[in-house]
Amino acid sequence: MDVNPTLLFLKVPAQNAISTTFPYTGDPPYSHGTGTGYTMDTVNRTHQYSEKGKWTTNTETGAPQLNPIDGPLPEDNEPSGYAQTDCVLEAMAFLEESHPGIFENSCLETMEVVQQTRVDKLTQGRQTYDWTLNRNQPAATALANTIEVFRSNGLTANESGRLIDFLKDVMESMDKEEMEITTHFQRKRRVRDNMTKKMVTQRTIGKKKQRLNKRSYLIRALTLNTMTKDAERGKLKRRAIATPGMQIRGFVYFVETLARSICEKLEQSGLPVGGNEKKAKLANVVRKMMTNSQDTELSFTITGDNTKWNENQNPRMFLAMITYITRNQPEWFRNVLSIAPIMFSNKMARLGKGYMFESKSMKLRTQIPAEMLANIDLKYFNESTRKKIEKIRPLLIDGTASLSPGMMMGMFNMLSTVLGVSILNLGQKRYTKTTYWWDGLQSSDDFALIVNAPNHEGIQAGVDRFYRTCKLVGINMSKKKSYINRTGTFEFTSFFYRYGFVANFSMELPSFGVSGINESADMSIGVTVIKNNMINNDLGPATAQMALQLFIKDYRYTYRCHRGDTQIQTRRSFELKKLWEQTRSKAGLLVSDGGPNLYNIRNLHIPEVCLKWELMDEDYQGRLCNPLNPFVSHKEIESVNNAVVMPAHGPAKNMEYDAVATTHSWIPKRNRSILNTSQRGILEDEQMYQKCCNLFEKFFPSSSYRRPVGISSMVEAMVSRARIDARIDFESGRIKKEEFAEIMKICSTIEELRRQK
């Protein structure tokens, strides 16, 4: 049957048609090779935006630094980073005037956090620059390595387990004349294989001690490693993102805690909330502006875009903001918070892996590491790369580039939002002292500006005033990329507003489908995504039912688990048919065992195992939920797991799903090839670290998880906990006298071993 496509839209309000404009099918682009070029672009661009600033030299590291603060006022529309200190401070003062007590209260909240946060906060996050090995590592490993090096250099404040004490060690480490570190290296030898008589490369892993003098250590402590941002849609060029080391991370965390606390109290801030809460918050601002403009005023909204937000921000400005925000607070608190911006003013950008060269004629490939770029002959490079290298050379030290201005992506999102909101706040009539006034929304570098005025000239004047005010604090609104419209239709952080925020369901399309973790998790994630979209994104019942059927189909094809009575032949069908025939209650079989699908849109919230439990044959139950099953490398599954879901646009979302541990919750074994590289020692450290943490969690299950306070070690905490639990269990008759005695004996043995060590 032919369908006239216009019929589809007869009953649909125009704003709901947005889901049909979805451009992002297929995989997003990923980067390959080295990010060195992108990082050089960032460094060079950042310096270009601030080129009229003053040059100085860092006395400790010898790095040349450019300071654009209080530089010349811009005379054209080119982006620039010349923020004026007094303007920023005045904007802060006005923000405080219109929100009495906001800074004071946020400081008190943050002070409490500072005193309570433990070092393990820094284990969150994925890749982190590990300064001891000079490359990226998982956060937990990088932290463990840092603490290990600190302790072997006599820095032990961190043993209390408080983050603030770890940061004391960081400060002290910077005063030391030298730091001794252990590095991993690998030796390669050519040996003849006894069996095949061929020559093979044998690798051995070694650890060696290395001393870093003060200058080298400081350079590493101030280094941000760079990578290429992956999976960015809608861009032809890739760009670089930064990952800081452990010395900077803790300080940044406290600054962002303060800024987050301030953002929570600002109605114009799109951070730190998300989803429906964010939509509600923002809709209020729009409603306020529209209500006030109904009778006499015009109201226009700019869907805003800023040029190179990060590269024009300046850590020195953030220092000024923090100094103002914390002005009545205790000295120690002000010091802790001012260290992050100071470190960022002296930061170094690591250029990454360097360049790969290959000679077609000689079949040779060679890597030019970033360290060599300072003095290699430039005749080997093409013209654009040559220009980049020439430009960056004066800034290079040991393969890192001095980068004083600019912020690097994603470092101070909350604090930069506070700066943006402070300019939006200046739009109140009592500040503009004229007929036009403005308000708006800010979320990191994204903004929407709503201007009200009696006539079009007033609107234009308001926009111009906003534009120029932004310039004074280093924010550059892009006139080319911003779009003005009657209030009621605009876009902000990929939310489209048309008389209310429109559910753009198509953005979630990439997250539908089979994730590929394992049979158990995939089923759970799949139905949870459908459930969440019914709640949040106007996914209607008929469409949801169809999505569910498509998902089940997709799932069966992925895991080759078609129903036991199907005609489809796959590698698994022989086994599944056999299971089908010998099962009495066929409805009890999981879909991944060839069973029928019992999900419909009413029961998506129930894990499949629970949904079918009553319908299962007893022996099937016994096989399915058998922790001793030898074929499954079992991980303990919390009742709630987290999956990372990729929408089409914007950051990956963390989504919770229910997980019931069955024999389908397998984890694939780790690839063997890593075991032959210099990573191996690190991998072993990481596994040991993991085991210790898991054991600790056993003693302090999350339900009763009160972290042991005081300066007890993990072992002491676990032993004392074991004794308390054993006594309670013994007195209530849950364990026998012999068992109680045995536990006490083990505890004493552990303590004895610790003393001997």
Swiss-Prot record:
GO function terms (MF aspect): nucleotide binding; RNA binding; RNA-directed RNA polymerase activity
Catalytic activity: RNA(n) + a ribonucleoside 5'-triphosphate = RNA(n+1) + diphosphate
Gene Ontology cellular-component terms listed: host cell cytoplasm; host cell nucleus
Listed EC numbers: 2.7.7.48
Sequence ranges of Polar residues compositional bias: 55-64
Region (Promoter-binding site) location: 249-256
Region (Disordered): 50-82
RdRp catalytic domain location: 286-483
UniProt keyword Flavoprotein, yes or no: no
Chief location category: host cell
Protein modification: Phosphorylated by host PRKCA.
Alphabetized Gene3D superfamilies for the sequence: 6.10.140.720
Location of the protein in the cell: Host nucleus; Host cytoplasm
A single GO BP: DNA-templated transcription
Motif Nuclear localization signal, residue numbers: 187-195, 203-216
Keywords: Eukaryotic host gene expression shutoff by virus, Eukaryotic host transcription shutoff by virus, Host cytoplasm, Host gene expression shutoff by virus, Host nucleus, Host-virus interaction, Inhibition of host RNA polymerase II by virus, Nucleotide-binding, Nucleotidyltransferase, Phosphoprotein, RNA-directed RNA polymerase, Transferase, Viral RNA replication, Viral transcription
Family from the record: Belongs to the influenza viruses polymerase PB1 family.
Quaternary structure and interacting proteins, as annotated: Influenza RNA polymerase is composed of three subunits: PB1, PB2 and PA. Interacts (via N-terminus) with PA (via C-terminus). Interacts (via C-terminus) with PB2 (via N-terminus); this interaction is essential for transcription initiation.
Function of the molecule: RNA-dependent RNA polymerase which is responsible for replication and transcription of virus RNA segments. The transcription of viral mRNAs occurs by a unique mechanism called cap-snatching. 5' methylated caps of cellular mRNAs are cleaved after 10-13 nucleotides by PA. In turn, these short capped RNAs are used as primers by PB1 for transcription of viral mRNAs. During virus replication, PB1 initiates RNA synthesis and copy vRNA into complementary RNA (cRNA) which in turn serves as a template for the production of more vRNAs.
Protein name from the UniProt record: RNA-directed RNA polymerase catalytic subunit
Native source species: Influenza A virus (strain A/Turkey/Minnesota/833/1980 H4N2)
Taxonomic placement: Viruses, Riboviria, Orthornavirae, Negarnaviricota, Polyploviricotina
Gene coding for it: PB1
